[in-house]
């Protein structure tokens, strides 16, 4: 049972809100260059 308590304690200490916010910022940050790349590849025709 000791290892399970350790895992539960580890998961309860993780701040999932910060992880979600950083994930969203990364997705938004990647979306900009992706749009520019698509515009360049398709010669401006989205």
From Swiss-Prot:
Residues 39-46 are cytoplasmic. Residues 1-20 are lumenal. It is a single-pass membrane protein. PSII binds multiple chlorophylls, carotenoids and specific lipids. InterPro entries: PSII_Ycf12_core-subunit. The modification N-formylmethionine is found at residue 1. One of its GO terms (cellular component) is plasma membrane-derived thylakoid membrane. Its main location: membrane. Disruption phenotype: No visible growth effect at 10 umol or 60 umol photons/m(2)/s, loss of the PsbY subunit from PSII, no change in O(2) evolution under medium light, increased susceptibility to photodamage, cytochrome b559 (PsbE and PsbF) is in a low potential state in isolated thylakoids. The chain crosses the membrane at residues 21-38. GO terms for biological process: photosynthesis. Keywords: Formylation, Membrane, Photosynthesis, Photosystem II, Thylakoid, Transmembrane, Transmembrane helix. It is found in: Cellular thylakoid membrane. Belongs to the Psb30/Ycf12 family. PSII is composed of 1 copy each of membrane proteins PsbA, PsbB, PsbC, PsbD, PsbE, PsbF, PsbH, PsbI, PsbJ, PsbK, PsbL, PsbM, PsbT, PsbX, PsbY, PsbZ, Psb30/Ycf12, peripheral proteins PsbO, CyanoQ (PsbQ), PsbU, PsbV and a large number of cofactors. It forms dimeric complexes. Part of a photosystem II (PSII) assembly intermediate complex PSII-I; crystallized from a strain deleted of psbJ, it forms monomeric PSII before addition of the oxygen evolving complex. PSII-I includes 3 assembly factors not found in mature PSII (Psb27, Psb28 and Psb34). A core subunit of photosystem II (PSII). PSII is a light-driven water plastoquinone oxidoreductase, using light energy to abstract electrons from H(2)O, generating a proton gradient subsequently used for ATP formation. Helps stabilize PSII. This is Photosystem II reaction center protein Psb30. It comes from Thermosynechococcus vestitus (strain NIES-2133 / IAM M-273 / BP-1). The gene is psb30.
